[in-house]
Amino acid sequence: MKIIATLDAPAAIGPYVQGKIVNGLLYASGQIPLNPLNGEIVGDSIETQTEQVMKNISAILKEAHSDFDLVIKTTCFLKNIEDFSRFNAIYSKFFDKEFPARSAVGVAGLPKNVLIEIEVIAEVKS
């Protein structure tokens, strides 16, 4: 088991790590739209926040020697399920080949009152 940590993604705001690699798979903790440099929330729209979350995930994938083409599954938590189509428009831009399996769930609230949180499971390049 290997812990993944990068300064290019936000530091954990609780008792968890950015990700762990186990048996060739990366399990990345849920990412919210925080600026990795100062920990501040980026944007107030679902589009801007989704873009930042995906950038944070990209940094974790890179640190783990993976990328969006190797993502197996995502779990997406939306504060406002009405944002679903606008969220999809940004999310889909990050996948070049195939989309991963996915669950998308509307929730009552998220840490720091953000609009989106996404966690991923991805294959790691050997």
From Swiss-Prot:
GO molecular function, a single term: deaminase activity
Name a single GO cellular component: cytosol
Superkingdom in the source lineage: Bacteria
> Into which family does the record put it?
Belongs to the RutC family.
Entry function: Implicated in the regulation of isoleucine biosynthesis.
**Protein name (database record):** Putative regulator AldR
Organismal lineage = Bacteria, Bacillati, Bacillota, Bacilli, Lactobacillales
User: Quick one: which gene encodes this?
Assistant: aldR
